[in-house]
Amino acid sequence: MVDVQYKNVSEFPGWSKMPQFIHDFIQRNGIKTVIEIGAGANPTLPIDTINKLGISYAINDFDVHELSKSSDAYIKTVFDPCSSNFYHANTYDLVFSRMALEHVSNAKTFHKNIFGILNPGGYAVHCFSTLYALPFVLNKFLPGPISNILLDIFNPRDRSRHEKFRAYYDWARGPNHILIGKFEALGYKVVNFTGYFGHPYYKKIPLLNKLEEIKSAWLVRHPISYLTSYGSIILQKVR
């Protein structure tokens, strides 16, 4: 039985809550070896936390330049988990990603490759944005220059540390039985699948933001999977 939940975006672990979320997950499950996919310039756990946990913690990106922005104290691995001829020698108790899954161009290949680098009983944990929340529909279908302008208006950030990458949203949806079946067909057990309603992109427009908050509160009580804005999923390798 899959644990499916729906929550408000304020509980989404994919941003500032992620370090504590992953820290607690590692401790709770006796994790010893970890790799963060798509960490690039912004690894989730700081080096001192990694040392206190006593774990091996590698960070990954397919872009050498992005990895070069992070401290050399990290174990760095360059590979593309979407590659059809993927090979990576090491295996891990935990593979996780933060706001990277929406940028995966071929989700089936990605999740198959991640499955291959998990130890038996190991976990894959992902936090990601989903369709069909309006901001992400626009992000997917608008030309890059226009979506860049909108991002700078509604959610400005330091591009040297948080670059904007193309989003595909392949398998990036809220909880639904079709998607759960796809993960199970690859050999995963879906431990938990949570959808989150709401987003921060209307904060500069108070009335619109208030309406979004009202809508999100209603959707938590009456969930519609395809209207989630974000998702988190915990998968386990069981075969």
Model-derived regions: residue spans:
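Aromatic-acidic/polar surface patches that form glycan- and anion
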Residues: 7, 11-15, 103, 168-173, ...
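Conserved N-terminal segment of class I S-adenosyl-L-methionine
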Residues: 1-90, 94, 228-231
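Short amphipathic alpha-helices and their capping/turn segments at secondary-structure boundaries
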Residues: 26, 112-116
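S-adenosyl-L-methionine-dependent methyltransferase catalytic module, highlighting the catalytic core
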Residues: 108-109, 113, 123-236
